[in-house]
């Protein structure tokens, strides 16, 4: 497109992703302040093809405007960093009233046939403290994570503080949380 510059960054494997990543950034050129709107078509022509598969991800919502998106997107591949990493406990949100996956919650697979998130917790219409006092209802994975964080803290208290298992932390806590989770047909 006229008036646009494309920046390519060839990444290396990282703690978040063992695959080769290529970062593409489209920025306004010259004295423009905005990127031209419309439908963009990207054509990739590799010099050498290893497996022929590629995925595109966009930055999270805070970094783009609400009209930016893929023409045809895949809702089953909506994870963001750091949820793609192997070791962190990744938490999704679900609606406890309907026992359904929250539409705003990321999901998908990462490399090596691993799927994420690891657990789901209530994250829709959660009653919580409001700024300035009182209570309010909020939705989001930020409301689901405290359920899992509190459970992890209780497990660690039982194991480490109470002397029942001095190695009950990290991946062991994650394994116990996953094993103890209630399965549902919804996801």
Predicted regions and their residues:
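Hydrolase catalytic cores
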Residues: 123-186
């Amino acid at each position: 497109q006229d008036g646009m510059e494309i920046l390519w960054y060839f990444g290396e494997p990282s703690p978040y992703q063992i695959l080769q990543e290529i970062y593409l950034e489209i920025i306004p050129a010259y004295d423009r302040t905005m990127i031209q709107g419309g439908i963009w078509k990207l054509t990739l022509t590799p010099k050498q093809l290893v497996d022929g598969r590629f995925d595109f991800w966009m930055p999270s919502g805070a970094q783009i405007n609400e009209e930016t998106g893929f023409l045809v997107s895949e809702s089953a591949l909506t994870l963001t960093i750091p949820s793609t990493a192997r070791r962190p406990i990744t938490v999704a949100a679900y609606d406890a009233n309907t026992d359904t996956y929250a539409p705003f919650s990321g999901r998908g697979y990462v490399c090596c046939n691993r799927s994420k998130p690891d657990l789901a917790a209530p994250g829709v219409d959660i009653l919580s403290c409001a700024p300035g006092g009182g209570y309010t209802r909020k939705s989001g994975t930020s409301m689901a994570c405290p359920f899992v964080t509190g459970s992890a803290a209780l497990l660690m208290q039982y194991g480490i503080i109470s002397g029942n298992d001095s190695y009950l932390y990290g991946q062991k806590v994650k394994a116990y949380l996953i094993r103890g989770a209630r399965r549902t047909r919804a996801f």
